[in-house]
A protein has these predicted regions:
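Hydrophobic membrane-embedded alpha-helices
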Residues: 1-167
Length: 167
């Protein structure tokens, strides 16, 4: 929520100096946030996970992507490669990370880079078409609601069953 309050104000203030300055400022803030995230993760991973300054870089790479900083592959083959690599990075994060993986730390780069490459690839790639199928769109529409409700449901079930759940 803090991002959606501060980012428009930052855009309002900085964009009047031109796109190049905007990209540089956003890039500098993203880099500082990433370095801070890695540093804070070593000290207190909960603080790094929950506090906005240490996660702002994740939002800002999306903003920089929207501003075209990372360019776009011109050919369908290039966009397909981007989306396949992105999907593989996200899948690797899901399969390799466990409860012992330091996170966010530098490990957050893997799924964030994957998401960036996947978005950069576009919807007209085979991966984009796969992710646009009905069942996956259904899951996508539900995912944020499930994310918001999963913890209260786990706590309720744990309380109702009176036995800890192995997560």
């Amino acid at each position: 929520e803090q991002f959606y309050l501060t980012f428009p104000l930052l855009l309002l203030f900085v964009s009047k100096y031109g796109r190049d300055i905007l990209v540089r400022v956003l890039g500098a803030i993203a880099l500082l946030s990433l370095v801070g995230c890695i540093w804070m993760s070593a000290l207190d991973s909960s603080t790094a996970f929950y506090l906005f300054p240490f996660r702002a870089w994740e939002f800002l790479i999306g903003a920089l992507l929207a501003l075209g900083l990372f360019g776009s592959a011109r050919t369908l083959q290039g966009r397909t490669a981007s989306s396949v690599i992105g999907l593989l990075l996200i899948a690797a994060s899901v399969m390799v990370f466990d409860d012992m993986t330091p996170f966010p730390a530098a490990n957050a780069l893997l799924p964030c880079a994957g998401a960036m490459l996947l978005i950069r690839g576009g919807a007209d790639t085979p991966v984009g078409r796969l992710l646009s199928t009905g069942p996956l769109r259904f899951v996508g529409r539900l995912s944020y609601s499930v994310y918001l409700w999963h913890w209260p449901l786990i706590v309720f079930v744990n309380y109702a069953v009176i036995m800890p759940l192995a997560l």
